[in-house]
C-alpha cells in the first residue's frame, strides 16, 4: 500500500498543517463564546497542537479524535509533556464513538476532505448539541477545476474531490445545517499576502530519513505553487 500525504504529516509530526496554522485557529476560537460549560471536539486533532492550546487557554472540556495511529501517539506524547488532561480517541469522523448531542463546538481543520464528506458531516451533526457549531477550515477550489487540475490534486492528496465554496455549503446544508456562513477565505497566493504566518510548522528531524514520505511533502508544495491562484481555503461556520 502506497504511503499517503497524511502518512507523511504523521511521520514528520507536522503541526498546524492547514492554512494559517495555529494563528488562524486562535482567531477562530476568539470569535466563539467559550465557558466552563462548553464542550469542544477537535476533529482530526493530529499532533494535538490545537487541543492543547484550547485546554491551556480556555476553561472548557476538550476531546480529540484522529484516525491515524501515529498522530494519536504524537498527541498523547504532547499532552503528557505539557501535563494536560485531554480525552483522546483513535477513530474516524465518519463513525465516531460518542453519544448524540455531545459537543457544543466541533473544530475540523483540513481533515474533512480526506474522508467521505457526507458521512462525516452526518456524524458531526449527530454528536453536536442543539444549537451547536461546526467550525470548518477546508481546501476550497476558487473555481470549477479542469479535469487535469482536479486529477493532479486528488492524486497528491489521495482524495476524491476538491470542492468549490458553493459545493461545500451545499454539502453542509444537505447534512442538516440550516445556517452556513463563510467567515474567511483566500486563495493560496492571496493568503501569502496577508502576513498570517502559521506557528510551529517545524517537522520532527529526529525520525530516520524517508525519501518516499519527503516526496509527499514536496508534492504538496508543488500543488500550492502550481495552483495557488485557483485553490485556497475557506472558514465555514455551520450552526444547528
Protein language model annotation of sequence segments:
Residues 182-240:
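Conserved Class I S-adenosyl-L-methionine
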Residues 18-36:
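Conserved alpha-helix/loop element of class I SAM-dependent methyltransferases that forms part
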Residues 160-176:
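Short alpha-helix
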Residues 41, 47-95:
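Class I SAM-dependent methyltransferase SAM/SAH-binding core
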Residues 94-105:
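A short acidic, Gly/Pro-enriched loop at the edge of an enzyme's catalytic core
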Residues 105-117:
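A short SAM/SAH-binding and catalytic strip from SAM-dependent methyltransferases
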Residues 118-133:
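A short glycine-rich, Lys/Arg-flanked "PGG" loop and its adjoining helix->strand segment in the class I
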Residues 12, 139-159:
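Short, glycine-/aromatic-enriched active-site segment of Class I SAM-dependent methyltransferases
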